[in-house]
Structures are given as structure tokens and as C-alpha cells.
Amino acid sequence: MQDSPVQAVIFDWAGTIVDFGSFAPTSIFVEAFKSGFNFDINLAEAREPMGLGKWQHIEAVGKLPSVNQRWHQQFGHAMTSEEIDHIYATFMPLQKAKVADHAEPILNAIDVVNDLKDKGIKIGSCSGYPREVMDILIPAAAKYGYHPDYVVATDDLPQGGRPAAFMALKNAIELGVTNVSTCIKVDDAAPGIDEGHNAGMWTVGLLLSGNEAGLTYEEYQAADAETLSVAREKARLKLQKSTPHYLIDTIADLPEVIADIETRLLAGERP
């Protein structure tokens, strides 16, 4: 075991470690709006607030100007909390039924994680999924070899989820981290990057494997350089507003970032 100045890396789940393109939640949001109220949203609208807890995500979709306008046209008022509750109640069984189908690791994620563990770095994780979804996803991902040291779901803590620091800090506490400046938060969505900043950690945004690029793994594999460049810049525009310390394509590029942060920590730098 090598001694690293990095104590922990805290990963998001969908679009970061598993589920290339973060399709499990987005497609289900579209389905839940349709099933719950016969109301159509598109994938771009479903993706817009990704990273929040799912109830808050539905609320944020309802507040998008395009959705709010159509909701007013169809129902004569803005979306209410009761309507959000109904969509959420529709969403949950759909999500639980599908999430295990999206548990396959992204690229060489398992090797990257295991190499971090070999260096004595703890592996934390948190998600916008609630606990009842995570209870299905965790064992499904374990079958592929993903075994984080700790998992926090968005509804585990009474204080709430992203973009606040609570889930990241809960990981730090449970992993025995003595200094949050030795932690790295890795995420494909802005609220998760904000979470890392709010927790005083280094932050790494993922451009091509997650929600903002919205590519399937097959599209990613087949894409030429120009297509990837367009997808990369689309994601960069969204993620750079959260000013992550690093922006990389996928988890496959993370080892170089870890090495750089190790050098910076040893030189006395902090996030």
C-alpha cells in the first residue's frame, strides 16, 4: 500500500461510475410525467436540474420556463407540491424497476477505483437517488465489482442533499477523514460539483460520460473527434459555471488528476 496525501475520493453514481450518459433517471422522468399527468417533457428538460434529489429535481423541471408555460396551458396553474408528490410517487416504482439495468460500470471505473484503494485512499459515494433506489443499485453494481467504502443516498440525512455539503461531509466523517482538503469530489453534474466546493474539497467534473453530454456508450464509441468536441463543449458550458478544479472527459482520465492533486497537497496547496 502506497501512502497518498489524498485521504478519500467521493464519487457520484449515475454518469460517473455507472450508467454511461446517466440515462436511468432521465428516461424515467419523462415516463413519470407522462404516466402521472399525461404531460410531455423532453430529455433535455428532464436532464436540466440533474444532480438534485429526485423530488427537488421534479420541482426544478416544473419551474423551467418551457415546462411551466405548457403546464399552465394544460392545467391552468403552476405545478403544486401535491402534483410533485404524485409525479414522484409515479417515478419511484419505475426507477426501482429499471435502475439495475443501468448498473454497468463506465469504461475502466472498477480498475481506477481499485487502484485508488491500493494506494490507501478511501472510496466514498453519494447520489441524487433516494435510499430505496440505492438499495437496488448498490448490489447490482457490486456484481460488476464496485464496492465503495461508504454510500449516502439523497434522503439519508435530515439536513438534505445537494448542492449543500451534507452528503460529502457525511462520507468524510464515516471514512475517518481528518481534513476535508485531502478529499476529492467527482461528479458529472453541477449540483454535485457545488456540493464538493461547499464541503471544502477538490472537485472534478466529468464532461463526456454523464448527464450534460447525454451520449449513450454506443454513441461515445462511434463518435468522431468533431462529435466528441461538440459534446464536450456543451457539457463544459454547463459545468464550468460551478468552477470545478478539474474538467476531464471520463473517470478513465482521473488517475492523472489524482497525481496532480497529490503533488499540490504535498506542496501545501489546499482547494
From Swiss-Prot:
GO BP annotations listed: DNA repair; organic phosphonate catabolic process
InterPro entries listed in its UniProt record: HAD-like_hydrolase_sf, HAD-like_sf, HAD-SF_hydro_IA, HAD_sf, PGP-like_dom2, Phosphonoacetald_hydro
Keyword Amino-acid biosynthesis: no
Co-factor binding details: Binds 1 Mg(2+) ion per subunit.
CC cofactor: Mg(2+)
Gene Ontology terms for molecular function: magnesium ion binding; phosphoglycolate phosphatase activity; phosphonoacetaldehyde hydrolase activity
Record field: catalytic activity: phosphonoacetaldehyde + H2O = acetaldehyde + phosphate + H(+)
EC number(s) on file: 3.11.1.1
Membership in a protein family: Belongs to the HAD-like hydrolase superfamily. PhnX family.
Function: Involved in phosphonate degradation.
Subunit relationships: Homodimer.
Full protein name: Phosphonoacetaldehyde hydrolase
